[in-house]
């Protein structure tokens, strides 16, 4: 196991999900978020050390689930917490590189509190590996239950590739 494994904790993994992005998907909720948005429905994921360590076995399970032909998945969703938290970047990038190499045709959606035009170089390198980014902090005053895949109207869905 590499050091990157110790760099990421996660709260929940769903091997089959139909809520967090289009189609049937795998969803990983990572730990660690600096935004601490008022009204967040995932407050338990804010601390980096919350949840449990993301291991090689967890990563292998995601790859196997994405390759599963009995329950075809359209792709992977990364949420949290925040997948683009600086301490999550190495492990998230490693996972996404494997998805790109081993799970052809699968798309990747990611939710982050960071704005696309404010990302660091390291965050941009991770975003280059995904298809869709939903960016922006959740703003309680802009909450709109009618929105699809967004909690508040300030958040933007970026179809990157």
Predicted features along the sequence, with ranges:
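N-terminal [4Fe-4S]-dependent radical SAM core
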Residues: 1-29, 38, 42-49
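Canonical radical SAM enzyme core domain
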Residues: 47-63, 85-127, 132
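Short Fe-S-cluster ligation motifs
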Residues: 61-81
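Residues embedded in well-ordered beta-strands within globular domains across many folds
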Residues: 77, 131-134
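Active-site beta-loop-alpha junctions enriched in small/polar residues
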Residues: 81, 113-115, 138
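P-loop/Walker A phosphate-binding loop and immediately adjacent motor/lid segment at beta-alpha junctions
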Residues: 86-100, 143-161
